[in-house]
């Protein structure tokens, strides 16, 4: 039985947030098409994950060197391990998030920091870093109210670009990406943009 991990990084309701609507649409469509799949859903805002910083980094290093950890470090490392192992065990992963102020919401950065561990999602080699989880099937769902498709705006998009860059570093070079954009910039076409985007979400979910 396939294990599927759904990761949502938006605490706004679907009535107000397009990426939340994309997430709900994908999950419901996928569940209907795959009733026997083992599914785990992570709401990153609800989890209130501790920032990835000195305690977790020091704990991870000390463990790798066989050194004794403080109680605080043990707790931080255990939290990282919990979410890292969950990700490693998943056959398929879906990320859903908005673009806020040119990048992803902070909880997603924290979560990705948990997953970016040498020897687990990538390794160092004489020829440079090498991804270790390229066999996973991944979908990226992103929403942004402005239109970033132009040559001028594209470099300012650091949400989907950020996530797909990290995935590529881990060896996942071909994630399927669905983006809904411009629904705030073009209010006269907003409903059409969202509806057409959600249809694309359904198509991807049905065959995922």
From Swiss-Prot:
<comment type="function">
    <text>Quinone reductase that provides resistance to thiol-specific stress caused by electrophilic quinones.</text>
</comment>
<keyword id="KW-0560">Oxidoreductase</keyword>
<dbReference type="InterPro" id="IPR050104">
    <property type="entry name" value="FMN-dep_NADH:Q_OxRdtase_AzoR1"/>
</dbReference>
<comment type="similarity">
    <text>Belongs to the azoreductase type 1 family.</text>
</comment>
<keyword id="KW-0520">NAD</keyword>
<comment type="function">
    <text>Also exhibits azoreductase activity. Catalyzes the reductive cleavage of the azo bond in aromatic azo compounds to the corresponding amines.</text>
</comment>
<dbReference type="GO" id="GO:0010181">
    <property type="term" value="F:FMN binding"/>
</dbReference>
<dbReference type="GO" id="GO:0016652">
    <property type="term" value="F:oxidoreductase activity, acting on NAD(P)H as acceptor"/>
</dbReference>
<dbReference type="Pfam" id="PF02525">
    <property type="entry name" value="Flavodoxin_2"/>
</dbReference>
<dbReference type="GO" id="GO:0016655">
    <property type="term" value="F:oxidoreductase activity, acting on NAD(P)H, quinone or similar compound as acceptor"/>
</dbReference>
<dbReference type="InterPro" id="IPR003680">
    <property type="entry name" value="Flavodoxin_fold"/>
</dbReference>
<protein>
    <recommendedName>
        <fullName>FMN-dependent NADH:quinone oxidoreductase 1</fullName>
        <ecNumber>1.6.5.-</ecNumber>
        <ecNumber>1.7.1.17</ecNumber>
    </recommendedName>
</protein>
<dbReference type="InterPro" id="IPR023048">
    <property type="entry name" value="NADH:quinone_OxRdtase_FMN_depd"/>
</dbReference>
<keyword id="KW-0288">FMN</keyword>
<comment type="subunit">
    <text>Homodimer.</text>
</comment>
<dbReference type="InterPro" id="IPR029039">
    <property type="entry name" value="Flavoprotein-like_sf"/>
</dbReference>
<keyword id="KW-0285">Flavoprotein</keyword>
<dbReference type="GO" id="GO:0009055">
    <property type="term" value="F:electron transfer activity"/>
</dbReference>
């Amino acid at each position: 039985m396939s294990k599927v991990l759904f990761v949502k990084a938006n605490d706004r309701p679907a009535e107000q947030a397009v990426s939340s609507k994309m997430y709900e649409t994908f999950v419901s469509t996928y569940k209907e098409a795959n009733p026997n799949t083992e599914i785990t859903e992570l709401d990153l805002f609800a989890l209130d994950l501790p920032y990835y910083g000195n305690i977790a980094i020091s704990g991870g290093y000390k463990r790798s060197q066989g050194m004794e950890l403080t109680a605080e470090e043990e707790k931080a490392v255990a939290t990282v391990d919990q979410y890292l192992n969950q990700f490693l065990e998943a056959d398929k992963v879906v990320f859903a998030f908005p673009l806020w102020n040119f990048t992803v919401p902070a909880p997603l950065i924290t979560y990705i920091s948990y997953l970016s561990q040498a020897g687990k999602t990538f390794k160092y080699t004489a020829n440079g870093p090498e991804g270790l989880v390229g066999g996973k099937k991944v979908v990226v769902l992103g929403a942004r109210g402005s239109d970033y498709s132009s040559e001028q705006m594209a470099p300012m998009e650091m949400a989907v670009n950020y996530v797909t860059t990290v995935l590529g570093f881990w060896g996942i070079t071909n994630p399927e990406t669905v983006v809904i954009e411009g629904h705030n910039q073009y209010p006269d076409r907003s409903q059409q943009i969202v509806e057409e985007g959600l249809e694309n979400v359904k198509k991807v979910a049905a065959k995922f």
